[in-house]
Amino acid sequence: MLLEKLIRISKKVKDFKVNIAYSRCEKHVLTFACQEMGWQLTTKKGDGDIIWFIDGVKSDQIDMVRNLTYGHFNRYPKSYILCNKREFHILLNKYSNFFPDAFKFVPNTFVLPDDYVEFKDHFETHKDAILIAKPSKGRCGQGIFFWKEHQDLDQEKMKECLYIAQDYIPNPLLIDNKKFDFRLYFMICGVDKMEAYIAFEGMSRFCTEDYIPPKASNDNIDDEEREMMKMNGYSEDNLMSHLTNYSLNKTSLKFVNNNDFQQKDDGSKRLLSTVMKLMEERGVDIDKFKSDVKDICTKLAYAYRPHLVNNYHKVIGPSDEVNQNWFHIFGLDVMVDDDHKVWLLEINCFPSFDCRLDEIEIDPETKKKVKVK
């Protein structure tokens, strides 16, 4: 396995090196991880046992990668395509056609405007349907809104900004009457022989408003918060009751920055391990929760594999010497409903490990743990 291989190499090689020349803002957390592992850092071009890219392998770096048969690389070629919500759900929908029961951890999803007819039929047959719409290339919760009843799509707007629309999960598991989700990290290794790993330490992100079903009134946002939401492109719905995004909830006067997160469990961001204990107290089978998350990661790895293998051989070539030396860390956003079912909300192909601008202590602490583990 790649991790065991890296550990064996690092023990045999006196100066096991990680090249941070291409890592930009992530070099700080890499420096910490190398200190913990006893590894060396280098910025020399073409040098290192691990070459860390922030974005991916660029065209002028391909020859270097091909020639470094001993190097290990953290970005699969053209993996950025999978970051697009639209492309991701088109991929999963194709698999669901062949394996209808395999991907039931994903809410029913419409890719718009392509699925307009199915989208319209859904509202006609499900009168109480509530869908949550997300821009295909959106981030930080921007541009998200709810569809509570059928309304014709603005076809021109859809062409400018493609959307996905998903069945809203109306029964989230609540802690302190707040909705929450998890950001976990999993890693795919190798090309022709693929392996997957998951780190069961991550972050749990809480809404700052008590949960209110989407049909309820949203009058509990004060004028200052509503104006801030408008400035950042958020809809009029009280998204602070529904979206856990830090970029949204940090603007709330109710945001709790708990720097003593190792001892207390009342912050708007908490450790995954802390929240799992609270879930267990509420009757959630944590072993099953972990098993369900592993099942999601396994199926995502299988779904991604043809794309990753195909683009690897197109860009790098059929080199058996180096194709097992590639790995990629993904950010996985999941939530649990009050029936204890685990749902996949989103996957991030380029989760940030930048610790420079983190405003609360739990962020760099969690990112460092993920890098080391």
Regions found by a protein language model. Name each.
Residues 118, 122-332, 336-343, 348, ...:
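Catalytic core of tubulin tyrosine ligase-like
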